[in-house]
């Protein structure tokens, strides 16, 4: 199933609200940001993002975690896994993350998002410095060895076509804001690396 290309109407104009992004952020005592977790299936994107959200919640910050599987149950349930649908999936999530950041939230997005162009598309939606690319850096060998959902086994058997890392390319980030050595450190250590970066960027205090 393929989504139709949206058509822009010149009669539709942006309505500026009185309560703006800065006001919402000040209420929450935090700086809006979109942390975009990217990496191969099984690298630990959702695990690290979830653990980070737990820590941020404990510290009193306002967050929302967007998970690749979860959004396909609703917002992107009409999309398949063709290249066109995968691009549309990321475009929709990028727009949603932008709205959530506008609400003053710290957004954690965990998606394979294999192509640099699609990640750049999301980056370009946001003000400079608000998009934080987090590369959950684990090798194909490590991810396939974990295979928590049995997807690599199915892909190797030809049951899942166009599976990222097997018969579909994953383009690793060239210069991510955060590079997490997910094959070497514990989840707790990776969370600390993220927290330190957020403090340096004054997203949190």
From Swiss-Prot:
SUPFAM superfamilies: P-loop containing nucleoside triphosphate hydrolases. The active site is at 113 (phosphoserine intermediate). One of its GO terms (molecular function) is adenylylsulfate kinase activity. Pathway: Sulfur metabolism; hydrogen sulfide biosynthesis; sulfite from sulfate: step 2/3. It catalyses: adenosine 5'-phosphosulfate + ATP = 3'-phosphoadenylyl sulfate + ADP + H(+). ATP binds at residues 39-46. Keywords: ATP-binding, Kinase, Nucleotide-binding, Phosphoprotein, Transferase. Its EC number is 2.7.1.25. CDD domains: APSK (cd02027). Disulfide bonds: none annotated. The keyword rRNA processing does not apply. One of its GO terms (biological process) is hydrogen sulfide biosynthetic process. HAMAP family: Adenylyl_sulf_kinase. Catalyzes the synthesis of activated sulfate. Belongs to the APS kinase family. This is Adenylyl-sulfate kinase. The gene is cysC.
């Amino acid at each position: 199933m393929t989504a139709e290309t949206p058509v822009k109407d010149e009669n539709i104009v942006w309505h500026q609200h009185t309560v703006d992004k800065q006001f919402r952020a000040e209420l929450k005592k935090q700086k809006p940001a979109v942390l975009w977790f990217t990496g191969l299936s099984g690298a630990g994107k959702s695990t690290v993002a979830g653990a980070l959200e737990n820590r941020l919640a404990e510290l009193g910050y306002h967050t929302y975690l967007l998970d690749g599987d979860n959004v396909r149950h609703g917002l992107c349930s009409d999309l398949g896994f063709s290249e066109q649908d995968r691009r549309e999936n990321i475009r929709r999530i990028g727009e949603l993350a932008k709205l959530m950041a506008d609400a003053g939230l710290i957004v954690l997005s965990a998606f394979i998002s294999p192509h640099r162009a699609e990640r750049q598309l999301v980056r370009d939606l946001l003000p400079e410095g608000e998009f934080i690319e987090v590369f959950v850096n684990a090798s194909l060998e490590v991810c396939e060895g974990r295979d928590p959902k049995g997807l690599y086994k199915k892909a190797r058997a030809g049951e899942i076509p166009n599976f990222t890392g097997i018969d579909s390319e994953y383009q690793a980030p060239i210069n991510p804001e955060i590079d997490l050595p997910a094959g070497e450190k514990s989840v707790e250590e990776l969370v600390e690396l993220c927290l330190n970066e957020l403090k340096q960027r004054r997203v949190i205090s």
